Amino acid sequence: MHKINCGSAIGASSIALALAVSLRLIYNDLDMFKRIALKYLRCWAQKEERKPLVLRGARQVGKTTLVRLFAEEFEHYIYLNLEEKENAALFAADSSFEDLLSGVFFKANVRQDSKRVLIFIDEIQNEPKAVQALRYFYEKRPDLYVIAAGSLLESLMGRHISFPVGRVEYMALHPCTFVEFLDAIGEEQLACRVEQIAVPQSLHDYTLDLFKKYMIIGGLPEVVANYAEHRDMVRLGGVFNALLSGYRDDVEKYASKPKEQDTIRYILNYGWTFAAHRIQFAKFTNTSFRSADVSNAFRILEKTLLLELVYPQTSASFPILPDLRKSPKLLWLDTGLVNYVAGMQEELLFTTDSDELWNGDIAEHIVAQELLGATTSFGEKRMFWVRDARNSQAEVDFLIRYKSHLLPIEVKTGSNSKLRSLHQFMDESRESMALRLWNGPMTSDTIARADGSTFTLYNIPLYYAGQLSEFVGGKL
């Protein structure tokens, strides 16, 4: 592969060599737990009707590194970072697409008739005309492999950028999953077992302990790579601090008004402790911020993909219609960040109360992260169910949609755990199965409904949270 980085200056050879070796080591580490995304990229590249691909994801989920790894499979790689003015100028000029293409290939010293050329347009939000150009890559040069990404793409889309409808496709990139975490720390065989839902009972406690570490550390690639190399959670503090500083330093890019910036900063400083909780904008942390200001700040942060506000489903059947009048549940990008900011890592690491550990908000939050990480489709929303009838309130942690089925998921451990809300959901539903994630082994129970009919309750180890669609598909 001939790699041309149009956004890098040439320095002393010794420094360049050291940097290249360093980056290669980092990329090798990240490759271990981004192989799922690499599989998707390979499928995209093999499509006959291939469209330019837009990578969507929050900052620091590994978009740029992923594409660089993918580029190893191409003969030529052209990297255009539009944070650099000379690269942005290629697209900003009022010239034809043909002239633009000539400039890109000339700058990269690559012939236009070369085979298997991957062009990566990074930080594309810096030049709106580059977004418009994606249409012409699709219409005039479908032989080229074009990927675009941007660290603040989501927050800027609503203001400046409109992607060409029907001429691009999207891929979501999330923090690494438990399977990818296992790959990263050298547990490839166990990763395959988890992926295949085939962990033997003799490895149950060992796998659950690793899932606990994953729940504490989270899945941000830089954090996982650091832990994989050093196996030292204390060292991760500096990594988390740097990541948080980056998110907070971007506030001015998220919003231009001082009031918006102040509210966003407040949420980024104190909102982590409300992870997996339902929140009310009017009473959020008892501050003086107006409800409308808090709501707007959360919407802005949601566009950056740092968090998601999940509104409840109130029906136990289709259609899926989240009730926007009810309080949403707050889910952050990464459970490791939540633990670090809330100062909970040590407590979680050394707790001896298994039921308290696995029945808490953090267990629910890591399950939410796994449910989202199981898909590369952009725009997927997590779901939960509430029943607010007078004298009969209930809440099911999550719902999962599989084809024409809408199934409840409860995160609740202990052999004597009460599942009252799940039973209420199933009394209103005609589904034949329900799911409980717990710290015990894989089992199932036949449960009678109030009307005398029955359903099967599957008790599933927590470490299979990312494989629930495959599990359900094997049962229905």
Question: What is the role of each PLM region?
Answer:
Residues 442-476:
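Domain-level recognition of nuclease-like catalytic cores that cleave nucleotide substrates
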Residues 66, 70:
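Hydrophobic positions on the alpha1 helix immediately C-terminal to the Walker A/P-loop
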